[in-house]
Amino acid sequence: ENCPNAFLLQEVEKTTKFCLRYAQSLPQLAIDKTNVNWLGADLAEVTVTISNDGYLPTYLSREAKLLGTARPVKVSLQGQIQSFIAGQAILEIGDLEGYSGVNAEYRSCEVTTGAHAPLTHTLRWLVQARKGAEITITAFQPKAGRAVVKLVL
């Protein structure tokens, strides 16, 4: 049931602020680093670092993990690849923690962090391809979104 008209604007503003703040805390996948290293005429090593830039982890809650409803982060490499020597076209990297999961201790003018689940994950592929080949690396998870980068080998 709605509140009296005189208070409706206040209530809508509070609810909207909460919804926007909550949306900002959701997990957000990002591709931080990419590197291509040629090891031979048609052999390239492709590395990529995937991160969760959000506050919440990609699994959102421990309960989702317990119930088995949390989906892993998947990373794909597609494009003009002749073959994969190491790695596969689609890799599952599991969960990435968010900033909420970082163990931190505060002392006078000092912040230290302890062991915590990873916020980032680095993947490596060895691919057979031609120089100048175009590839697309995509990180995806239903709750954390999609991050895409295109590279020319």
Regions found by a protein language model. Name each.
Residues 1-153:
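C-terminal accessory segments enriched in acidic
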